[in-house]
């Protein structure tokens, strides 16, 4: 009996050990992936250890500079969700008269969003790695989040099927009533669409919710911009229209999308991406539009994130870049040989 009890205890202990190793392995894998993503997308500004003035681009960036991610006294005040939301927010126009910015909104244009570049799971991996830079661990239950999304999709599917059945039943009833009246009056009677309008609206709403739930679940594991080609835009505009768009684009370039955090003009700005002084000579406006709408569709491993530009914003920024036509830098004069 005692031997049997010991065998059971040993089996349970073994299972717990396997579970712990599996959980630990998942955590280690997540941290490793987060470190790789951080190195690719974040290190040039935030530095290898998250310290200020450590990344090669840090000193070139306009104020406010990137936070010290190694500072536990400050970073410890943020929840995991706060860090996630900072990395995956929508960009805000910080210009006077621009977007409304709430007290809790993070609105630093030079910190890009990765909402349209990385999967939700990948962003959580980055959050987990950032936590290690100030000696903390990710507390957010990522796997539970995935299960919730799967359950949400299942619920949305059931709701859609139910609303579809209700719509079809109401439409059938209205059609049968119209046929009955046609037979009685011996003339065609139109179906009363208002009789099933409520069910039709409910079905349409349920379909929207189903589509949204499907996209959210897809984006949890898959990158949102992968494989999404951008259609060629119509960039035709009168000179006055082009000038107005370029003026808007100049504002968006700096105050909404923070392009100056990575690119320089006239020596001012970041040095992650190429200088844009002569973009008007080097780059075609149509190509620029497609690139800034979805860089990953054109170059999957580029460090430049997709920032969620609307069509209008992408046209405006493209028009602004087309106006940048600085003269070529003069070649340094050859040194004269000593006489």
Labelled PLM ranges:
Residues 1-30, 128-247, 318-339:
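Post-cleavage N-terminal segment of exported redox proteins
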Residues 41-49, 91, 134-137, 296, ...:
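A generic secondary-structure signal for well-formed alpha-helical elements
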Residues 59-131, 219-222, 261, 266, ...:
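Extracytoplasmic electron-transfer domains, predominantly the class I c-type cytochrome c fold
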Residues 29-48, 84, 126, 227-229, ...:
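Sequence/structural segment immediately N-terminal to covalent heme-attachment motifs in c-type
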Residues 21-33, 43-74:
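Accessory recognition modules or surfaces
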Residues 15, 23, 72, 112-115, ...:
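Generic anion/oxyanion-binding catalytic loop in active/binding sites
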Residues 47, 54-57, 96-98, 137-143, ...:
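Short, solvent-exposed loop/turn and secondary-structure capping segments
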Residues 51, 258, 298:
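Conserved helix-loop functional segments at active or binding sites
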């Amino acid at each position: 009996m005692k031997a049997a009890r010991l065998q059971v205890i040993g089996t349970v202990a073994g299972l717990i050990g396997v579970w712990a190793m599996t959980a630990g392995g998942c955590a280690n894998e997540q941290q490793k992936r987060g470190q790789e993503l951080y190195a690719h997308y974040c290190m040039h500004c935030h530095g290898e250890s998250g310290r200020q003035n450590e990344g090669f681009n840090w000193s070139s960036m306009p104020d406010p500079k990137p936070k010290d991610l190694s500072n536990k006294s400050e970073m410890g005040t943020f929840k995991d969700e706060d860090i996630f939301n900072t990395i995956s927010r929508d960009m805000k126009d910080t210009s006077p008269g621009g977007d409304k910015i709430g007290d809790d909104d993070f609105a630093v244009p030079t910190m890009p969003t990765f909402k349209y570049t990385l999967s939700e799971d990948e962003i959580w991996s980055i959050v987990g790695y950032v936590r290690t830079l100030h000696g903390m661990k990710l507390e957010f239950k990522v796997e539970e989040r995935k299960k919730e999304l799967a359950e949400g999709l299942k619920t949305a599917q059931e709701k859609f099927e139910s609303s579809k059945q209700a719509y079809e039943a109401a439409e059938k009833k209205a059609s049968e009533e119209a046929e009955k009246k046609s037979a009685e009056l011996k003339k065609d009677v139109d179906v009363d669409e208002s009789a099933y309008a409520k069910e039709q609206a409910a079905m349409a709403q349920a379909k929207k919710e189903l589509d949204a739930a499907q996209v959210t679940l897809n984006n949890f594991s898959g990158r949102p911009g992968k494989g999404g080609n951008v259609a060629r835009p119509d960039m035709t505009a009168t000179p006055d229209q082009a000038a107005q768009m370029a003026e808007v684009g100049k504002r968006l370039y700096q105050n909404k999308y923070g392009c100056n955090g990575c690119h320089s003009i006239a020596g001012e700005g970041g040095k992650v991406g190429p200088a844009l002084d002569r973009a008007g000579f080097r780059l075609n406006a149509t190509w620029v539009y497609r690139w800034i709408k979805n860089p990953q569709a054109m170059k999957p491993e580029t460090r430049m994130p997709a920032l969620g530009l609307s069509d209008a914003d992408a046209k405006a920024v493209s028009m602004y870049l087309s106006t940048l036509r600085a003269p070529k830098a003069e070649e340094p004069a050859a040194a004269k040989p000593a006489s």
